Amino acid sequence: MCGIVGIVSSEDINQQIYDSLLLLQHRGQDSTGIATMEESMFHIYKAKGQVSTAYRTRDMRNLVGKVGLGHVRYATKGSAESIEEAQPFYVNAPYGIVLIHNLSLIHI
């Protein structure tokens, strides 16, 4: 079980994603992450723990963009202590993609 939010707006959305994740906090308390996109550049911040303690002002200032995703994780597989397993995931091939999911992939 996780909490997922996505926003597309004509204005910067980092605060709206943060506020949405606070409302979704009951869906997962192991880690949290936000990814935003400004023009063609992704900005990503991930942390262990709850939303209210994970983000500082300087982190939020770096999450500029009008498109974004947010995630709170309840670890059902893998390690709750691993920041590498916190989402969003970013892959830089061939052009870059940010992914958030709420499922288990088994035997693929």
Task: Place the predicted regions along the sequence by residue.
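Conserved small/polar residues in nucleotide/adenosyl-binding loops
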Residues: 106-108
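N-terminal glutamine amidotransferase
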Residues: 1-102
